[in-house]
Amino acid sequence: GAETFIRILQAFGKDTFIRDSYNWGSTKRGVLSSLLHACHPLPTDTSENLKKLAKQAEISDERLVEAAMFAPQWIELTEKAIGWKGLTSAAYYFHAHTNETCDDKKKAIIARYTPIDVDDLREGAFDIDWFKDAFKTIGKQRFEVVYNAAKYISCSNSHTRARKFADATNGAVKAADIKKEIIAKRNKDLLMSYGLIPLGRKPDKELLDRYQYLQKFLKESKEFGAQRQESEKKAVNIALQNLARN
């Protein structure tokens, strides 16, 4: 319940949560991370009560968002408690665009915001309309808080894909710079984000240039083994779909 949730956050102090359950162990942070992950709202918990408890414990709105990203069962109640309209949508944008597994409850919530299948999202498909709506609703400053808290979603770095997609869609990166990185690293997440960067003054030319580059990337993949070829082919197909959505 909410009282336990807040007590756990008090016990954490300024310590960070441990994402990987294999590393929880018997340390203070490990035990508290395990407890936070397992803590669920009670049917009797209200947003008003959570707000009151957090205020009494001097837990900031930003810390509540971090905790809710780590333990997503608290996202919706947290949105109401702190009054951040659009938090649930923004938070689940990040959850949906990692390659972590989703339970039925999470799938149902994601389905409220996008018609794209959860498995396709996990593979790298991107709903640009969902992202833009979530970003506009929550606002740039609060979105940055969610963006930074996304590190608590997974035990790997799979949350970085959602960040790359966000940076691309917001024009925080340049197509030429991303292209250089793709050439240097053949990073599939960057490849899939490449088509999401806003088109410039000559959209038709840029669209063609990006399409041709994706085809070139696909052709180059024939230099590698069968498994890598298949993986890169899938990434190119998704990149083309994302380009078409731009």
Regions found by a protein language model. Name each.
Residues 1-103:
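Non-catalytic protein-protein interaction scaffold segments in large eukaryotic complex-forming proteins
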Residues 4, 13, 174-175, 246:
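General structural signal for secondary-structure boundaries
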Residues 18, 183-246:
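Extended alpha-helical scaffolding segments
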Residues 57-58, 62-202, 206:
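Extended, well-ordered protein cores
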